[in-house]
Amino acid sequence: MGTKENTGARNTREALILAGLEELNEYGIQHFSTCRVAKACGMSCAAPYKHFKDSHEFIAEILGYINRLYDAEQTVLLEKCKHDSAREQLVQVSMHYIRFLTEHPAFRRIVMQSFQDCDEEYRVLRGQMSIKTYEVVSRYCEEVQMPPDVRKRKTFIVRAIIYSAALFFDNGELEYNEKNMEQVRGLLEREFDLP
């Protein structure tokens, strides 16, 4: 009987996290309402507090959910391209991130929200999505002996390409297809070719 209860609690917790994801997507962190999340799940306003200490822990768990999903996908990708050069791995990771953000628009909206007025824990959780990417970037920069100022500039440009492409695909400004993904790949590769 304990296993059924654990499974039920896990399912309820996951349902709350998924509804919370939609809540964050629509209202942002500053206007997050556990009561709206509970109602979206057909539960009482008190139900989320059986699974999360408070709304802070609830939001942190939603961000952790996004991190775990992306980390699992990125781990598979990096395993597939582990014998490629650091540059190719960086291009692959960048392309995958564009796909991830495009295919999960709610995640993109949450990841791209301003976290300036938020708790440090939220900023740290959002930053955890980039840990493996940062390792690949560091390896590539060491290989090509890239100076810090160039690394900073290129990081900004590559991030701008990634976020712009995901946004353009999501809002229909660019059709989300392989031809356009190849054009984006060309932009990324061109940036790595430039001094």
Predicted features, each with a name:
Residues 99-135, 167:
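Short secondary-structure transition hinges
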